[in-house]
Amino acid sequence: MIPLIAIVGPTAVGKTALSIRLAQQFNGEIVSVDSRQVYRGMDIGTAKPTPAERAAVPHHLIDIVDPDEAFSLAVYQDLATAAIADIAARGRLPFLVGGTGQYLAAVLQGWQLPRVAPRPDIRAALERQAAELGAAALYARLAEIDPAAAASIPPNNIRRIIRALEVYEATGKPISEQRSVQPPPYHTVTIWLTLPTPALYARIDARVEAMIAAGLLDEVHRLLERGYHWDLPSMSGLGYREFRPYFEGRITLDEAIARLKYDTHAFARRQPAWFRRLPNVLTLPADASDLQQQAATIVRQWIDA
């Protein structure tokens, strides 16, 4: 069994700082679990670790595809599994760090995912239906043909709804019937960082303001100039989609910033639903004065067990 330390928590809670200190202390390397940080050139809006942080500890699965390249849960799972095995084979301790709950669950629970290649023709037709009829209509259809999949997908997550319908139309089988679980060869402990909601929202708002000061608008402008359009999954994600109406002249910058804060608060509220499903979860207050000492004790006891 490969010892594996997962550090999870809502966005802006402090996962990066803690994971770097622990990885330095325990001869570790970090495998990012962030569906947005895989994209090159999307640095500020995804809150990637800084170059100095990435130089301090090796990081994996950051900057691996261009913003217009297809990227899926199955691809992520394969890459993360390979990275974890490589880190362990070199005698180092893998840390799985991030807040994309579905990616975490797929790796730590050993999901066996349907390997159905994207079908652009089917997807385009479904996207047209979504634009014409709304997400609720597609969700109702999914609930009719695959109740199990619908129960696991938020009704407003149109990309996952479309993917589930796409797999069904391509194969004739519900996506839920094509999934199974095979426990992976990991000895995992999950450290879940928490904060009271007001404190977390304050951190999120401060991060958003820091992103603006660091040049997020320039980053978005560069991406658009390079031909990456708003309908790409990368550009329609959190941190970028909120600025579309601003760049199109429909809202003010202050309104776009307020929208980003609001959307990030909502995202942070949804994240814990995934963390509760992870193996061997131990919660720690992210604002504890001895946070690193508490976390280091957990790691030491786990790898010695």
From Swiss-Prot:
InterPro entries: Dimethylallyltransferase, IPT, P-loop_NTPase. Keywords: ATP-binding, Magnesium, Nucleotide-binding, Transferase, tRNA processing. Catalyzes the transfer of a dimethylallyl group onto the adenine at position 37 in tRNAs that read codons beginning with uridine, leading to the formation of N6-(dimethylallyl)adenosine (i(6)A). Belongs to the IPP transferase family. Pfam families: IPPT (PF01715). ATP binds at G9, P10, T11, A12, V13, G14, K15, T16. NCBIfam families: miaA. Substrate binds at T11, A12, V13, G14, K15, T16. The keyword Endoplasmic reticulum does not apply. GO terms for molecular function: ATP binding; tRNA dimethylallyltransferase activity. It comes from Roseiflexus sp. (strain RS-1). This is tRNA dimethylallyltransferase. The lineage of its organism: Bacteria, Bacillati, Chloroflexota, Chloroflexia, Chloroflexales. Its EC number is 2.5.1.75. Monomer. One of its GO terms (biological process) is tRNA modification. Its cofactor is Mg(2+). It catalyses: adenosine(37) in tRNA + dimethylallyl diphosphate = N(6)-dimethylallyladenosine(37) in tRNA + diphosphate. It comes from the Bacteria.
